[in-house]
From Swiss-Prot:
Function, as annotated: Binds to the 23S rRNA.
Protein name, entry field: Large ribosomal subunit protein bL9
Family statement: Belongs to the bacterial ribosomal protein bL9 family.
Gene transcribed to yield this protein: rplI
Biological processes, Gene Ontology terms: translation
A GO CC term assigned to this protein in UniProt: ribosome
Modified residues (N6-acetyllysine): K89
UniProt GO molecular function: rRNA binding; structural constituent of ribosome
Top-rank taxon: Bacteria
Length: 149
């Protein structure tokens, strides 16, 4: 199925690219999320007329994401208290929701879907580096300090 991309999509293309994807991927993911439209003659003409407007909107979203990433980077460290045993092993774990709540409480609004934990959930006390994917191209890092209650 031919679609026109309205946003940058990983491993597929960027704004304005006309790509061929499987019908289910287009119908169930790209079109409902507003990342693509079917490549009909009407849509191609409509897109070409609005191309500059869409590019400006994309640049505005990227600038807002960069501003949020700078705010997150400015936090540097966030402390989370959790129950732990004698050797520093946590009872339970600290996941994306806990980290997102702690950063939001520190003053920067973050969704749990933006938190990236490359080594999985945090299960020990100490300092852990956590990254945030604010936009497909914009990342921020924060040190999460886990202390025992």
């Amino acid at each position: 199925m031919q679609v026109i991309l309205l946003d940058k999509v990983a491993n597929l293309g960027s704004l304005g690219d006309q790509v061929n994807v499987k019908a289910g991927y287009a119908r169930n993911f790209l079109v409902p999320q507003g990342k693509a439209v079917p490549a009909t003659k009407k849509n191609i003409e409509f897109f070409e007329a609005r191309r500059a407007e869409l590019e400006a909107k994309l640049a505005e979203v990227l600038a807002a994401a960069n501003a949020r990433a700078e705010k997150i980077d400015a936090l540097e460290t966030v402390t989370i208290a959790s129950k732990a045993g004698d050797e520093g092993k946590l009872f339970g774990s600290i996941g994306t929701r806990d980290i997102a709540d702690a950063v939001t409480a520190a003053g920067v609004e973050v969704a749990k879907s933006e938190v990236r934990l490359p080594n999985g959930v945090l299960r020990t006390t100490g300092e852990h580096e956590v990254s945030f994917q604010v936009h497909s191209e914009v990342f921020a890092k924060v040190i999460v300090n886990v202390v025992a209650e």
